[in-house]
Amino acid sequence: MRIKTTNSEARELVKARVPFKASNTDGEYVGNTYVVYSYLWYPIFVYKDGQWFENKDKYSPTTSRQTSQLRPLGEDIIKVNTQELRDLI
């Protein structure tokens, strides 16, 4: 079950790796990997094997804002490009 929330309040859910649905963003598990999507197809964060990864590619001002709102603060995050992020999923 996914928790309904807003983008501005979803950061703690992302950090705790809880499935959620917000304004054009979603957090869900794909197998054992936690993925945060923008518009259900563009991955912005992936948590795999104890490590956070962030998409370093710029897509749109909206996606950049979502990334800022959802970034799990205080975590070590490796920035990779979109294809590398998709390969992790």
Segments from the language model and where they lie:
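Terminal leader/tail segments of proteins
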Residues: 1-89
